[in-house]
Amino acid sequence: MTAEQQSHLRRATAKASPIVYWQLADLWQQRYDVADRPMDGSMDPFFFVTKTKNFIPHEYPCRTEFKKSFSGRRPQPTAEFDAVRWWLPFASPRVDLSGFWFRPTRIGCWARTFLDARSAGRATLRLSTCGGAILFVNGLEQGFMAPYQRNLEAQQDFEVELAAGPNEIRVYFDDLAERDARFYFQLDYVEGPSVETSVPVPIAAGDADALEAILEGMRFDRTAYLGEDVTILFPAPLPVALSCHIEIEGDFMSIERFDYDFELEAGATKLALGTSADMPADFRHFRITFKAGTLSLGRTLGVEICHPERQGEAPATLEDRVAEALAEVAAHSEPDTVCAFARLALGQGGEETEAMISAMLPVIEDCHDCADFVLVPLLFAYTRWSDLLSPALRDRIENAVLNYRYWMDEPGNDVQWYFSENHALLFHTAAYLGGRLFPDAVFVRSGRTGTEQTKVGEERVRAWLDHFERWEMAEWNSVPYFPIDLKGLTALAACAPDETIRNRAAASIVRLMEIVARSAHHGMLTGSQGRSYEHTLRPGRSVELSAIARLLWGRGWYGRRVHALPQLAVCIRDHGLRFPEELAAIAAHQSDDAQEWTFSQGENRFAALYHYKTRDIALGTIAHYRPGAWGYQETVLHLRLGHRPEAQIWINHPGETIQFGYGRPSFWGGCGTLPRVHQYRDLAILDFEIHEGQPDFTHAWFPLEAFDDTVVDGNLALARSGNGIAMLIGNGALEPVKLGPTTDIELRLAGRNGRWIVRLSDLGREVDLDGMQARFATLSARRDEEGALIVSDPDYGRVVFEEDGTVRAEGRILRPADWSVRGDAVHLKIPGRQPRRAAS
């Protein structure tokens, strides 16, 4: 059937707007290897402090070779167009196939659509992509672009002739994928005759329209699943019977996928997937595909799953919690080297454990990105329990260790990420411990003996510890990367041959957990983060720091994917690691006063952090951090209320409008444009001035289900969980999203100049939300002639937020430039709070 004979999805397409409906072919992928060679460079703590939009400057040899061969040259399509699926925009202007590739991989894809022109005429099309692309109109090639600068968008205008009636538009786009790849194109209809987009579909046009509306509006019936049945709600009945395939995946490093298939009848209004108790824990992506005949439509949703009922309350003693943590990981985590570590720590060798290790060895043998995450727990386990492994597996492990690439100065052709602090620690730890295991063998890439490799690794570990002890982490407060740092440090604390290194590593572990405790609200880290992802922001109970809090302080839950938990447990059980007892009380603040915690992180103290908490609320921000700059994965403000981990709010400027995407920044993780941020106690201000070309709104994560009471009215939003209360005030209307995945979860503030004022309090002082609103609804900020923002607060009086981040309030002066790496925690009286009476 030709395109002219089929039904069509027809959409108005205005001038100066993107063309967003397409048919796609299969994604072509081909491994791209170049000759092994060393690479210049060193650890770069500030790699994410981007200078040109979101461009990361480090270039691998494979990219250099690729550009030498293909930059400026016409891309070469690998096949003819054959439609296998239909792309629906869901508010994204791009056709976005971004993802994560662990080895250098050439990728390419065809896309096709039709522009139905009212009259013939000349038109201008603007093509944007990060890789290469060719544009065809009615079968005639109009030109190409091929900058191939990794993850940096380029644009090119094309003048084309449109005929009256349908005009076929084809785009072939390709690139070299290295780790996180921004693989997309955007085609804008800049100028020309009046047109509409017209995409052929093999079912009735009205049914195709209805299926798009259902995919656009579908959502989970809960914000998080803690044992309940998982249900996806449709906004309208299905117009036709269809097949539904769902792939449930974890984060981009997860090795597991769970597939479900359903047959849905016409008229269905929901999809019941079964109990979440039988599904894998963690934040999970549900990749949903509807198929009706040859029509294939899909989108991705995401939600947290946790199993608190099975896990129960944490044991009372540390010894029992250590045993519980090891047993939980051994029985319920992903089958990787971390799970194998926990099993070996419990004396569980044998076929199942060896199968886990064997399945992960290709990652190390082929130097996949993040192979260092896999290798370090394996080296720790091999050091302690190699006698539980078969001779054949030990030989294979030895071969993998000897052939691995431990640093960029060794020859290789991989795209392992050597630059961040957490990866650098793991590479150096692996070289140090791996060399010790095989002292007389030759490490192939460096040509060193194991003894020599150990010496080099030791020098680099010492240098890394020097840097950490002076500056700590540029990736401050990062929920995903604290466990990675702990993965390396626990291996050193247990296995380092040198006692000084063991002691320094142990002290560093304690320091990291002090930071977590100071920044935690009832055990859950709450505050600004240097690097964050949607899959580590949205969940609370199932992130690994929750499990670590359960291990150390008896409050938290387990997820499925872990990095450091069993290593930390073994360090406590077998290697004398101890934590100050007072950290438990700090992590779960219960007193009548408040804790104010100011500290700096990163080389030259570039990240100045402010945190304030009471037993009812916690709020953390970063002070005077690159206001107005393009952001990366920085979360600048984060708060929690009451005792429920899901009762959290953060505010950001989305880096992209596609939800559940791979952008850095993404829809929820990080900021496209960083705001000016100020905080004093439980009062904060965010001022956004958004760059052109970026999404024209800011938004707040505001999950109604997680709160006990809410009000959203005009420019005000109030929420209560337990005794904690939050008020958000916008400089425009705060619009609740009522359609799609973020229904009753997202508040949007339209405009490029968005101001949010955040004020927290508690039920004891305000009585209810009406009382909170009566006291604080008129809060506003005015700018004085020197650029300071001034707020008159009912409790704190005149609060002055100066442009350099200095705060003046209540006779105090807080200067972020003075905040030390070690930090200062002070206890402050809470205005209007009455001390709790002891039970009589």
Regions inferred by a protein language model and the residue ranges of each:
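Ser/Thr/Asn(+Pro)-rich, low-complexity disordered segments
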Residues: 208-422, 456-460, 555-840
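Accessory carbohydrate-binding/adhesion or oligomerization-edge regions at the termini
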Residues: 1-90, 172-211
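Short beta-strands within extracellular/lumenal beta-sheet-rich domains
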Residues: 103-115
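Active-site cradle of extracellular carbohydrate-active enzymes
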Residues: 418-466, 471
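Aromatic-lined ligand-binding clefts that engage carbohydrates, nucleic acids, or primary amines
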Residues: 117, 121-136, 169
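Beta-strand-rich ligand-recognition modules
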Residues: 134-186
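Well-ordered alpha-helical scaffold segments within catalytic/enzyme domains
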Residues: 338-350, 374-391, 427-445, 486-498
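Extended amphipathic alpha-helical segments with heptad-repeat/coiled-coil character used for oligomerization
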Residues: 490, 499, 503-566
